[in-house]
């Protein structure tokens, strides 16, 4: 198997296969669940809006893949600084049956100089998740832009108890980039938290070559056995089709407009 195919198979099993569109329907989410069960292995998770969790849970169970995790989003996509709302949404997501919650960090507050609200929001959302539900925190790297802010946001999230730090919502002009990924992975390394904290690039990872580049970077910074499904995810939709093409199990074309 070529190096690219090896990377493609590895990436597929690390995917949070995502649909977060305003026009999502039960039918689209059911199809997403079907797609997550691929001929060469399952994606790690699906990522959907909270209202679709019950239909997704039912579909995954009925198709014999209850182990595919269900991730959802809160405080999404704007990352407002109202802690009560973020916590209430997170509690509701857990009550719906989410296995993982991707919450948006109040990045505009950090840009304005307020570090405390982000810390408090993440800490309280993690408390709402408890030990069983993973909390991934989206810092919106493409809006923070500066290395100092990206590293500070990553540090705050980790100190407040985040299980993962995630680049982007996919709803702003600039999402995951290798440059931003490196900054965040270096924070995980430098804080000595690689055992407990994972990383998720999201938006803009569209091809097997992209995934290979991101995984090689993780291997370089945190070691070749670090990037398993507890420590690494790709947030993507169109990536799956490209990975399956690379692995020669489909000839579908990816949607060029997809996340």
From Swiss-Prot:
<dbReference type="GO" id="GO:0005737">
    <property type="term" value="C:cytoplasm"/>
</dbReference>
<keyword id="KW-0456">Lyase</keyword>
<comment type="function">
    <text>Catalyzes a reversible aldol reaction between acetaldehyde and D-glyceraldehyde 3-phosphate to generate 2-deoxy-D-ribose 5-phosphate.</text>
</comment>
<dbReference type="InterPro" id="IPR011343">
    <property type="entry name" value="DeoC"/>
</dbReference>
<dbReference type="GO" id="GO:0016052">
    <property type="term" value="P:carbohydrate catabolic process"/>
</dbReference>
<feature type="active site" description="Proton donor/acceptor">
    <location>
        <position position="102"/>
    </location>
</feature>
<dbReference type="InterPro" id="IPR002915">
    <property type="entry name" value="DeoC/FbaB/LacD_aldolase"/>
</dbReference>
<dbReference type="InterPro" id="IPR013785">
    <property type="entry name" value="Aldolase_TIM"/>
</dbReference>
<dbReference type="Pfam" id="PF01791">
    <property type="entry name" value="DeoC"/>
</dbReference>
<dbReference type="GO" id="GO:0006018">
    <property type="term" value="P:2-deoxyribose 1-phosphate catabolic process"/>
</dbReference>
<feature type="active site" description="Schiff-base intermediate with acetaldehyde">
    <location>
        <position position="166"/>
    </location>
</feature>
<dbReference type="GO" id="GO:0009264">
    <property type="term" value="P:deoxyribonucleotide catabolic process"/>
</dbReference>
<keyword id="KW-0963">Cytoplasm</keyword>
<keyword id="KW-0704">Schiff base</keyword>
<comment type="similarity">
    <text>Belongs to the DeoC/FbaB aldolase family. DeoC type 2 subfamily.</text>
</comment>
<feature type="active site" description="Proton donor/acceptor">
    <location>
        <position position="200"/>
    </location>
</feature>
<dbReference type="GO" id="GO:0004139">
    <property type="term" value="F:deoxyribose-phosphate aldolase activity"/>
</dbReference>
<dbReference type="InterPro" id="IPR023649">
    <property type="entry name" value="DeoC_typeII"/>
</dbReference>
<comment type="pathway">
    <text>Carbohydrate degradation; 2-deoxy-D-ribose 1-phosphate degradation; D-glyceraldehyde 3-phosphate and acetaldehyde from 2-deoxy-alpha-D-ribose 1-phosphate: step 2/2.</text>
</comment>
<protein>
    <recommendedName>
        <fullName>Deoxyribose-phosphate aldolase</fullName>
        <ecNumber>4.1.2.4</ecNumber>
    </recommendedName>
</protein>
């Amino acid at each position: 198997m070529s190096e690219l195919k090896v990377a493609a198979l590895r990436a597929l099993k690390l995917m949070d296969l995502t649909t977060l569109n305003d026009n999502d329907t039960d039918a689209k989410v059911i199809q997403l669940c079907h797609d997550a069960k691929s001929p060469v292995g399952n994606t790690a998770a699906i990522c959907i809006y909270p209202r679709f969790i019950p239909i997704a849970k039912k579909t995954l169970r009925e198709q014999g893949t209850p182990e595919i995790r269900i991730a959802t989003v809160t405080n999404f996509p704007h990352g407002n600084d109202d802690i009560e709302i973020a916590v209430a949404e997170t509690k509701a997501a857990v009550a719906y049956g989410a296995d993982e919650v991707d919450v948006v960090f109040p990045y505009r507050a950090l840009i304005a100089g307020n570090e405390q609200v982000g810390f408090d929001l993440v800490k309280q959302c993690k408390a709402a998740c408890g030990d069983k539900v993973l909390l991934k925190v989206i810092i919106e790297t493409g809006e923070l832009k500066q290395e100092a802010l990206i590293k500070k946001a990553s540090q705050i999230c980790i100190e407040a108890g985040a299980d993962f730090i995630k680049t982007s919502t996919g709803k702003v002009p600039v999402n995951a980039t290798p440059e931003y990924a490196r900054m965040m992975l270096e924070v995980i390394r430098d804080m000595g938290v690689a055992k407990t904290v994972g990383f998720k690039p999201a938006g803009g990872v569209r091809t097997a070559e992209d995934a290979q580049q991101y995984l090689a970077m993780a291997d370089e910074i945190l070691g070749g056995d670090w990037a398993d499904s507890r420590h690494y995810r790709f947030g993507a939709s169109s990536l799956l089709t490209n990975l399956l093409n690379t692995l020669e199990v489909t000839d579908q074309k990816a949607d060029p407009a997809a996340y």
